[in-house]
């Protein structure tokens, strides 16, 4: 992408009906390290690949955030923007609990953060958030998995992935998602890790240092596994050749991974 006269702010449309600032923000998400979400009958699992530290003296940046006991999120894109949105959503959860003495409905949280994304592309003087979110939780409707993007769109998924080389992960999910409702928690975690492994570059193996695993579900609050807890899944983990699509860069139709849109009554 190159600078042109239509990309100076988010309120300037190109003659072809494009908002270049929003497209640039989407590129920040697409170039972020990969994150995967997988939903079963009773659980949702998030896995995310942390960026390599700049030097041996720095640590990996966190990619998953707990928002409330029943909900959390993983991010791809600008980590600072992700932290800002995590603080915003934590505040929304606390306000709802104070007013209603119950957990905030997940569809409401997804709509709220989608509206916040959209406000930042509707007015001059603001920039889009350069981050995408995978929001995972469990409420009265059961396990839920939502994805938000810089344009403000909100999607309800059975399984999805975002970030660099995420098409390879989505291809893996498309092949296996029909069996997810019958999986127990350990099997769901392994599916999420295999999908994440498919999105890694050559020579990179998932380990307890560069991989985040988070779980939430029936009777299980949102939990980001510690390194020792993650060791159960990652010690000896290897990406299998059959988990990597032959052509990872071909965009495929992933409509089957979608649930109903959040604004459609069930």
From Swiss-Prot:
CDD domains: proteasome_alpha_type_1 (cd03749). PROSITE patterns: PROTEASOME_ALPHA_1, PROTEASOME_ALPHA_2. It holds the Pfam family Proteasome. It is found in: Cytoplasm; Nucleus. Residues 235-266 are annotated as: Disordered. GO terms for biological process: ubiquitin-dependent protein catabolic process. Residues 249-266 have a biased composition (Acidic residues). Keywords: Cytoplasm, Nucleus, Proteasome. Transmembrane segments: none annotated. One of its GO terms (cellular component) is proteasome core complex, alpha-subunit complex. InterPro entries: Ntn_hydrolases_N, Proteasome_alpha, Proteasome_alpha-type, Proteasome_alpha1, Proteasome_asu_N, Proteasome_sua/b. The 26S proteasome consists of a 20S proteasome core and two 19S regulatory subunits. The 20S proteasome core is composed of 28 subunits that are arranged in four stacked rings, resulting in a barrel-shaped structure. The two end rings are each formed by seven alpha subunits, and the two central rings are each formed by seven beta subunits. The catalytic chamber with the active sites is on the inside of the barrel. The proteasome is a multicatalytic proteinase complex which is characterized by its ability to cleave peptides with Arg, Phe, Tyr, Leu, and Glu adjacent to the leaving group at neutral or slightly basic pH. The proteasome has an ATP-dependent proteolytic activity. Belongs to the peptidase T1A family. This is Proteasome subunit alpha type-1. It comes from Trypanosoma brucei rhodesiense.
